[in-house]
C-alpha cells in the first residue's frame, strides 16, 4: 500500500498545516486549539501538567464530542518528577446486564470485524458501555493535580455556554454518521439543524451540557456514579432499552 494512502483512509479530509513550536516551561498539544488553550490557561495560572490535561479533556468533550466524552473511557500513564509511574484505569466496561450472548455476530461480516446483527453493539443505547472517563479524570486531578474541579472545567463550561465555531472535522464526522444521529431527537436538534449536518464555521451552543458540567464541578464524580446524573442516565437507558443501570 502506498505510504501516502493514509489520507484516503482518514476519518475526514484535511490538509496538514504544521509549524514548529517550542517551549521552556510547558506545552499542551491536543486535537483542537480551544482544548490546547484550556490546558495552557491552567499552566499560565500556576497549575501543573495534570491540571492542564484534565482541563483539555473537559474542553474536548465540548468541541470534539465525537472523540472525547465524560461517558467514555480511557487510561492515563503519569510520570512524576521523581521518576515514579502511575497508571489510572478509566476504561469503559460492559454493563452488568450484558454477557457473551447479548449480541449475535453477523455471519456476513468481514473477517476480523466485530459486526453484529442489527449493529446493536455499535449504534444506539444497546451499544453504550459503563463510563469510566469522569472518574478517571477526577481521580487523576485529586491525586496529582493542584486545582479544583471547578477550575479545570471552567474553560469547557465557557465554550459550551457561549458556543464555538464548528470545525470541518466535526462537520464531516456528523455527515458520516448523520443517519444514525437522526435517530435521537436531541442529538439531531444540535448537530443536524434543519435535517442537515451542522456547517463548518457555524456557532454551536450546548447550554444543557454546560449545566451538566456545572453540576459535575459542584458535586464531583459521585453525581454520575450513583447520584442525580447517574439516575437520569439510568432512567434514559431503561426507557431506551439500553443495558446500563445505576449499579453500573
Where are these regions (language model features)?
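Noncatalytic scaffold domains of N-terminal-nucleophile
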Residues: 1-37, 41, 49-248
Amino acid at each position: 500500500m502506498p505510504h501516502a494512502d493514509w489520507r484516503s483512509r482518514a476519518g475526514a479530509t484535511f490538509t496538514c498545516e504544521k509549524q514548529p513550536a517550542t517551549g521552556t516551561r510547558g506545552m499542551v498539544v491536543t486535537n483542537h486549539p480551544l482544548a490546547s488553550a484550556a490546558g495552557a490557561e491552567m499552566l499560565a495560572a500556576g497549575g501543573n501538567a495534570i491540571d492542564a490535561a484534565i482541563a483539555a479533556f473537559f474542553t474536548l468533550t465540548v468541541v470534539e464530542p465525537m472523540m472525547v466524552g465524560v461517558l467514555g473511557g480511557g487510561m492515563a500513564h503519569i510520570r512524576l518528577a521523581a521518576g515514579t509511574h502511575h497508571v489510572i484505569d478509566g476504561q469503559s466496561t460492559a454493563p452488568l446486564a450484558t454477557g457473551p450472548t447479548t449480541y449475535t455476530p453477523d455471519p456476513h461480516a468481514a473477517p476480523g470485524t466485530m459486526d453484529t446483527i442489527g449493529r446493536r453493539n455499535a449504534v444506539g443505547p444497546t451499544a453504550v458501555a459503563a463510563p469510566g472517563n469522569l472518574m478517571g479524570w477526577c481521580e487523576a486531578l485529586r491525586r496529582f493535580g493542584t486545582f479544583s474541579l471547578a477550575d479545570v472545567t471552567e474553560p469547557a463550561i465557557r465554550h459550551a455556554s457561549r458556543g464555538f465555531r464548528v470545525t470541518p472535522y466535526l462537520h464531516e464526522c456528523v455527515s458520516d454518521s448523520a443517519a444514525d444521529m437522526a435517530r435521537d431527537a436531541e442529538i439531531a436538534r444540535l448537530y443536524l439543524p434543519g435535517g442537515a449536518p451542522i456547517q463548518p464555521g457555524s456557532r454551536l451552543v450546548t447550554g444543557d451540557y454546560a449545566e451538566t458540567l456545572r453540576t459535575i464541578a459542584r458535586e464531583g464524580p459521585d453525581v454520575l456514579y450513583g447520584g442525580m446524573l447517574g439516575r437520569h442516565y439510568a432512567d434514559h437507558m431503561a426507557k431506551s432499552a439500553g443495558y446500563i443501570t445505576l449499579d453500573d
